Amino acid sequence: METYGLETLGIINPSAVYRNLTPAQLTEHALRRGEGKLSNTGALVVKTGKYTGRSANDKFIVDTPAVHDEIAWGKVNRPIEKAKFEAIKSKVIAYLQNKEVFIFDGFAGADPKYTQAFRIVNELASQNLFIHQLLRRPTAGQLKDFKADYTIIAAPGFKCIPEIDGTRSEAAILVDYAAKLVVICGTQYAGEIKKSVFSVMNYVLPKMGVFPMHCSANMGRDGDTAVFFGLSGTGKTTLSADPNRLLIGDDEHGWADDSVFNFEGGCYAKCINLSPEGEPEIYNAIKFGALVENVVMDDETREFDFDDDSLAVNSRVGYPVEYIPNAELSGMSSSVPKTVIFLTADAYGVLPPISKLDKNQAMYYFVSGFTSKVAGTEIGITEPVPTFSTCFGEPFLPLDPSVYAAMLAEKVEKSDAHVYLVNTGWNGTGKRMKLSYTRAMVTAALTGAIEQSEFVTDPTFGVQVPTSIEGVPSELLIPANTWEDKAAYQASCQKLAKSFVENFKKYTHMSTEVVAAGPKAE
């Protein structure tokens, strides 16, 4: 039996080894193994059990001399001793003996100058299907000569014992940058594999002069490129899927000297309240070859109920970028971005739905990474919680935030890009901004039409706010107009402004100009 070099990991007697199977073969294996069911559209549908989102508190980085001084240790990048990592790894390897093993050998990074080769070793065929569709798939020639830079082992069926293993729970995501190895166990949420790849890219690329971004990206027919930063649930995937523009990617990109490139070859979209009217591209991508997680499906008709969140609010679908009609399949733009959009979901209801930032404000709001945690993207979040996530991607950034902030400033300055802050969250009415209005605002930013508007300065946040945009009721553009109780509006403004100021105190390395670009707290 061909083992494709698995013995180098210590997996010496698997019952079967499958490498780079087609989506059809992987779907067959998953059904045979009882991992999921087929929907009426032909998609493979699985339930991931108790873990339906990232388990952020269960992620650890192996603390070795080689990386100790590089990693920004803290509540996000928690250290674990090498010996503990080795002990868990040995148990996971032992667990995989005599089991079927599914390998996907592929790539992250569409630009060949910066590509990293990943070997993903899966216990589950369904997870192997997911990563096959999410990463960049090799040609036959590339597969023949394949040599992995990094390896990820995903064994959801192996449960850690915290008292013995030194973990927080039965689940663990363990990253050893020195050994170029990631071990994921105890959780079946496929997003953990994808985000482990992202964490690796965020470690590797800055050393190559590339700015890694938690963003979506698209480009106009004439090549003008835009990037959309934002945390889960703020609209990256939705807003970058634009029928008038080519989608480069929906979540993870690198900004090089001459282009933006996708790390991935697929998309991982939220399914809650999905409709053919609201998001036709995503809705139509749920077909054969796609992996659907935690969407309620009728057992008889095999039809989805996207509005039912009883399995998870964070229901998801993974599919290859080819399933989006206007995808840029090369995964690369032909130029650097001219428009940079920071997406935020403000639960206070006081940030303007769109505003323009100067250079210092761009640095301030990027580093702050303000949003409200939206239900479902992490275990235990059910109501919006205001939060700050450094550089809109703190859970995935192993290096000091100043590294990424400096890279943004340098790239924006070089490309002369316009930077906008877009609030996809709530306003004074207590309702969330309509998607159609947000789309109209984003379109105005991309086409430059927004520049024809008159701008006023927001008294608290100092940003420039347009007073009119085609297709958007003018009263919604100025947050104060949506509040009946002006005193309550002022109180909310101050509450949020103070949160910003308090949060920014930890960034002691920032210039006085950048600090002064923040909100005015009284």
Label every model-predicted segment.
Residues 148-150, 154-204:
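Charged, amphipathic alpha-helical linker segments immediately N-terminal to NTP-binding catalytic cores
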Residues 239:
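Hydrophobic positions on the alpha1 helix immediately C-terminal to the Walker A/P-loop
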Residues 68-73, 176-185, 385-391:
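Gly-rich Lys/Arg/Thr-decorated short loops/hinges at beta-loop-alpha junctions or inter-strand turns
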Residues 1-144:
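N-terminal accessory targeting/assembly segments
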Residues 476, 481-522:
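Generic C-terminus detector
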Residues 2-42, 50-51, 206, 214-231, ...:
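Glycine-rich, often acidic-flanked micro-motifs
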